[in-house]
A protein has these predicted regions:
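Short secondary-structure junctions and interdomain/linker hinges
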Residues: 41, 70-71, 141, 145
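Generic intrinsically disordered, low-complexity segments enriched for polar/acidic and small residues
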Residues: 2, 7-10, 20-23, 44, ...
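Catalytic-core segments of thiol-dependent peptidases
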Residues: 38, 60-64, 68-76, 92-99
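Short regulatory "switch" loops immediately downstream of catalytic or recognition motifs
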Residues: 36-40, 75-88
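Structural recognition of the beta-strand scaffold that forms the well-ordered cores
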Residues: 48-49, 69-74, 106, 116-118
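Generic detector of bulky aromatic hydrophobic side chains
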Residues: 8-16, 26, 76, 83, ...
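Cysteine-nucleophile protease catalytic domains, especially the papain-like/related folds used
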Residues: 1-68, 125-126, 149-151
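Noncatalytic regulatory segments and standalone regulatory/sensor domains
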Residues: 80, 84-99, 104, 108-151
């Protein structure tokens, strides 16, 4: 019928995460994966998975202060989200519009002017980005964030 069908990135990762053709997933998917990992490793009694979607980077610093990094959504290389979207139909027939340049990083620190990330994209490693730019890119991708909290 010429229509493209695909999975819901709130539930699963569309595509291959090891290939540039993969898309990405959102916080609820990562929450499930982290919970499964904690259960498998016998660590669910020690940690709680927390979906902190809706919080700014500044608000997430409380976790960094407690020694806990945050899985953080922004954009590839902290560039603007393009206007164009990739579209596909979900199983229920809903049109899903993917915001391009979605990227997941690990927020690991901050100082007066920057947030610090472990960034797997092109082996960037630990990198600093200006706070205002980070907040803009985080908001553009939906303010998704996931972390662990010690019980």
């Amino acid at each position: 019928d010429g229509k493209l069908y695909g999975p819901d990135p709130y539930e699963v990762y569309p595509g291959d995460p090891h290939d540039h053709t993969g898309y990405g997933c959102y916080a609820p998917c990562i929450v499930k994966a982290l919970q499964s990992a904690l259960d498998h490793e016998g660590a669910a009694d020690a940690f709680e998975v927390v979906d902190e979607t809706g919080k700014t980077a500044a608000q997430l610093c409380e976790y960094l202060d407690a020694g806990m990094p945050v899985v953080f959504w922004a954009t590839l290389d902290f560039t603007p989200v393009p206007e164009e979207r990739d579209h596909w139909l979900l199983a229920d027939g809903t049109d899903f519009a993917w915001k391009c340049h979605e990227h997941c990083l690990l927020l690991v620190g901050y100082d007066d002017e920057h947030y610090w990330f472990n960034d797997p994209w092109h082996n960037h490693g630990v990198c600093a980005q200006p706070k205002a730019l980070v907040e803009d890119c985080h908001a553009a991708q939906g303010l998704f964030a996931v972390t662990l909290k010690r019980k």
